[in-house]
Every structure is written in C-alpha cells, then in structure tokens.
Amino acid sequence: MTPEFDEEVVFENSPLYQYLQDLGHTDFEICSSLSPKTETCLTTEEPQTPPTRVLQKQGILLKLTETIKSWTLSSQYSKKDDLLHKLDTGFRLDALDAILQQEVLLQEDVELIELLDPSILSAGHPQQENGHLPTLCSLATPNIWDVSMLFAFISLLIMLPTWWIVSSWLVWGIILFLYLIIRVLKFWRTAKLQMTLKKYRVRLEDMAANSRAFTNLVRKSLRLIQETEVISRGFTLLLDRVSAACSFNKAAQHPSQHLIGLRKAVYRTVRANFQAARLATLYMLKNYPLNSESDNVTNYICVVPFKELGLGLSEDQISEEEARNLTDGFSLPALKVLFQLWVAQSSEFFRRLALLLSTANSPSGPLLTAALLPHRILSDVTQGLPHAHTACLDELKRSYEFFRYFETQHQSVPQRLPKTQPKWRELNNVHTAVRSLQLHLKALLNEVIILEDELEKLVCTKETQELLSEAYPVLEQRLKLIEPHVQASNSCWEEAISQVDRLLRRNTDQKGKPGVACENPHCTAAPLLRPTLHIEDRDPIPEEQELEAYVDGIDIESEFRKDSLYHVSQEDRERQKREQEESKRVLQELKSVLGFKASEAERQKWKQLLFSDHAVLKSLSPVEPVESVSNSETPMNSDTEQAHSEATEEETSKPCASDKEDTRTEYMCDGPPKGQSKDTSGDQGHLLQGAHQCESEAKPPQAAAAGATAPPTPRDSPRLSIKQRLARLQLSPEYTFTAGLAAEVAARSLSFTTMQEQTFGDEEDEDKEQLVEGGERELEEK
C-alpha cells in the first residue's frame, strides 16, 4: 500500500470487499493484504531457515551458561540481599507497629488505610514472624556458603598431604586471616546498619508518643480554661473545687482574660506543631508519591490554602496583637477549632507515613540497596518535626503546670495569699460559696420539678403494669441526676459555714499577738485596728482631744460594708440612722458646752501636769495638787457650773445606741512594756481612732477614772500614786468638771502605750472589780 491513500483500492477478504461482492460490484482493483515487499522477503527467506537440531543445541548451551553465571552471582550477593531484605522488612513492620500502638490515627484515617492497604493494620499482629529487626546473633550466624567454603578448605588439606609442609602454612594462614577479616568487616557493617535502624525506630516511637502526649496536654489545658471560665461565673463543676472559685472581684472580668498566659501558650504551641506537620506531609506528597488513590487531594488537609483556614495559620510569623485579633482575644472557641485542625493534621501525617512505610512499597530483589532503606526516607521526611514536638510539649507543660498547680492553688488557699491581697477576700469567698449554692439549688429545683411532673403524669394517667415498669428506670435515672446537685449543695453549704467560722475566729492582730475573741455568735468580725497615733505636744487640750477621738469614729457603712454580708431591713436602717443622728446631736451640744478655750496660764499648768517628766516622777503630798490646781482655776459663775452639771447628768442618763447587744468591748489601758523607759517624752500622747463610742458616752468622769486598770508591776508605783491623787482631785468642790476631765485624760495618757481588749456584760460593780483584779494577776504572771 502506498503512502497516499487510494480510494479505488480494496483489500481482499476485507469487510468492504465482502460488502461489494454481496451488492454485485466486481469492477474494482483487488490488492492482497500483504505488501509486495513482505511477500518477496518471505519468498527469499524461506530457503535460508536453519534446521531445528541446530536451534536446540544453541538453546541448551545458552541455558547452561546463564545457570552457571546466575549461580556464581547468587553465591556472591545472596547473603547480602537476604540481610538487606530482613532489615528493610523488619524496620517497616516495627515502624507501622509503633504508629498503630500509639493511637495517633483518627478513626476515619484507620478506615482509609484499611481500604487502601489492609496489610498495614496487621503489622503488629503476633503471627508476623519477621515483624522485628534481626538481632546481632542472627546476623553473626554463618550461612550455607560459609560452611561449604570451610568444608572445602578442610577437604583439600586432607586430600593433599604435601600441603602439610611447614613452608606452605604461612601462605594458607594468610589466606585464612584475610578471609576472616573480610567476614568481620561485613558483620560490622551489617551490625552498624541494624543499630541505625533500631535508633530510627525508637525515634519514630518517641515522635508518636510526644504527639499523643501533646494532644492530651492541649485537651487538658482547654478543659482547665473552660472550668476556670465557668467557675468565674460562680458555678462549680467539681465538688472539691468550691474553694478554688475565683473571688467575685474578678466576676466582671472578660472570660477571655482568665488564664491568659495558658491561652497564649496553647495557641503558640499548637500553631507551631500544625505548621511542622503540614510541611512534612506536603514534602512526602511531593518527593515520595504513591498511587493516585493514596495521593488523592480530597483526602488531605495540607493542600487547603492557609487563607481558608484562618486563625493566623500562615507561614509568616505574626505578632501577639495580630494573633489576639484573629482569635478574638484567644477565646475558647477559636482555640478549640485550632486544636481540631491540629488533631486532623497530625493523624493525616502519620497516615501518609504509614502508607509510605508499608511493605507493599518495599523495593524487591537486587533493586534494594543500603541507600534505599526506609530509615533514610524517615529521616528525610521528618527532619525537624521531632524537635518541634519536643519543644512545644515542654513549653506547654511548663505553662500548664504553673497555672494548674501554682496559680489555682495560690488563689484557693488563703494561707498562701500575699500581703497585698484584697481587703475583703474572706467575704469574697463567702460570696462565691453562696453563689455556687444558689446555682446548684436552682439546678436541683429544675430537676425536681421535672421529676414531679413525670410523677403526676404517671399518677393521673391509668397505665398498664408494663408501661409503669418501663417508667421506673426513668424515675431512677432522674433521681440519679438529682444526687450530684445535692452533694454539691452540701459541699457549698459546708464551705460557706467554714468561711463564716473563719471570719469569726480571725485574729485581729497581724503581728501574731493573741486577741480576745468575741463570744457573741451574732456579732461580726471587727475591722483591723489602725496603729496608735503619736500626738505632738503643740496645743494639748485634753477635753477636745478626747471628744475628737469620740466623734471621728470609723464609718461602719463605708469601711466595713456589712450590708454586703448581712441584709438589714429598711426599718432597722432608719432606726440606726435616727440613733446615730441623735447621738451626734448630743455630742455636738456637749462639745459646744465644754469646748471653751482656756487661758494661757491654765494651759501651761496643764502642760506641766500632763507632759512634764518632773510632774510625773516627783513625789508630792496629797494636798499639793489640790492647791496648785485650785489656785490656777479661774473664777466661774454659778450659771456655768450649773450648765456643766446638767450636761454631765444628761450624759450619764443618755442610753447608748448599741446597748441592745449583750456584750460590749472596751479597750483598757495598761502601763508601758518592760523595755520602755519610765520617762516617756512629754510632748507625745496617744490617740486611738475607732474606739467604741458608747462606752465613752455612757461613763461619767468619775466612773471612767475608777475603771482604769492599774499597772501590775511595782515599777509603776509613782504612777499609781499619781492616779490616786488625781482621783482625789475630783472629790474637791473647787475642782470643776473641765479640770476633772483633764485629770482623767492625764491618768489615761500615762498608761496609754499598750491596749487590752476586754468584754463586759450587765454585771454589777463587784464583778467589774473582780475582772480588773484578774486581769492584773494575768499580766503579773506574763
């Protein structure tokens, strides 16, 4: 047939030829199916065909030479190929077993592996005899070739006795030594390769274990963050975590601000591990491709662009502010999405690695070389992935342990709180416990309402016994749902009781000095006492100082804020307000009556009497102070004295606003400590802010002077005599009320260095004197 197609040419025995014959057309050119050149070649080659016997002889010789050649080659490379095959198969099976044992694959990835290569899932089956790397003993075992060579050498020595000549021993010894050296070098090379494969297998196990540990640690961190967010709203997830609830001064804090350091650590570590696993998977797909089913892009997350994933998962480094904006302030939903991406990407990497290390992809026969062993593939694929796993795991573990074992317990245990803790942390703890109790009771009430509705339906409707028997398990399940809330409510109640008891037993002295606790179960804990103020001797007016200390008391509503703890009714508030206003009005009237200015000469006398060391230490006769004070008194008319006496009677008859309580507390005055000198500076006094107002208002000057506690030590005998003399001054008719008040302040200022808290009730004066004497004996014993 010519290169140019001729439409008139029809091949013989072709379908077109048969069709034309059937139609009756015979006027066309017929061409044979073979070309003329082929026909001529066939005619010329037919007489040159050799006989069959010659062909048979040539085939036998070729087969014999190929057999000898293959036997010689197999004798040289059979052992090496067998060892490489054992090492390759053993490493692949051990690597697959490590991946499957660590459970780093998701269920969908396991199903996909079972669909693509079912032999991978049976890699760790105990029936696999070659599932482990060959040991060094198996590698050192001689094969048939070595044994045959040894027997051949011995047989030659026995058959040829002439070789037993001593001169020939050197030659045969050198040959045997060289053979042994070659065998030892081969064994050393094989053992080194076996140790390398074993090291990479351990590295793969560690990488899978670190990946699993990191996943579990991220899950624990997210759970801790979620629990902290829920606890910050006042609801406790665990019964033993009631005391670990945050104080309500953080209740207004945004949920994303809790454990912000742990949130940042979770984001950084998960992002770094996700990027490393993604790059390793892409590298496998590019440099070690498999079949189209295994490398289908629909089965891989790593081919999805970063822009579609979001959350700052780009290859470029981003700042902390950008990460905060992209994750909505490291919110819990964003961290959960990032965690799900990491779990899927990690499982995808190990799935692709398992397919790559499958025994089905192992090179067969002489194609297997030391350069193609799977440990080189593993080293090339992983590269920096194990280091990234280890670094991220260590960083997240440090952050998690800090926030779990240090910050949480640091906030939950009151003894570990620093000195700069919130002022009302005890009240915050009580509020948290009560808030938790309220939420648990609400949940309990909802469950009880649901249970009651179901019981009413069962009672009202006439059901058969079978339906009732089916409803019993439902009721049992409802009761089991109620039980945790009951236990949690009991725990919250016990926590609130313990916090209130701690408030009642709290030591008011921060320096560790024992204080007298209030025995009244209804009284609240008093605020901490302020340090004693030192008053300079610039213009000492005793009555004004006493009244100012009385008026400028602590504002209970602003300082203590007891309304946050006890809910007082509106009537009680109005009554307390009226009583406070009445007491202030009486005090202002009393101060306006008594607050006149004394003359300079009288002030000088008071200074000498109150603040002079000579006046304190000098022993005077009982008549001298009366004369000195009576001489210094200015003449006053009878109207003024009558006003003073009326004010005194009004003050003594005025009931205290807080006399409804059973007990009252008074700070008694003691002498200075032993380490303090007697001659205290005369230009300094002491003022206690926040003293109990009702005691000062209800006592007349005579009772106040009589109720002062005498110092117990014999060193204070001069001061005792001074107090007695000052008490005698009040009995003098020439000694006015103002002078008596000044004498009372003088008596108190001499022993105003230490304070003692003592409780009084409605006892008689004899009981009071017994208490004073008992306090003196206790101080003498101390």
UniProtKB/Swiss-Prot annotation:
Compositional bias ranges of the Basic and acidic residues kind: 641-667, 769-782
UniProt-listed Pfam families: Vezatin
Keyword Oxidoreductase belongs to the record: no
Sections of the chain in a coiled coil: 434-471
The entry's keywords: Cell junction, Cell membrane, Cell projection, Coiled coil, Cytoplasmic vesicle, Membrane, Nucleus, Transmembrane, Transmembrane helix
Any single GO BP term: chordate embryonic development
Subcellular localization: Cell membrane; Cell projection, Stereocilium membrane; Cell junction, Adherens junction; Nucleus
Protein's recorded name: Vezatin
Organism placement in taxonomy: Eukaryota, Metazoa, Chordata, Craniata, Vertebrata
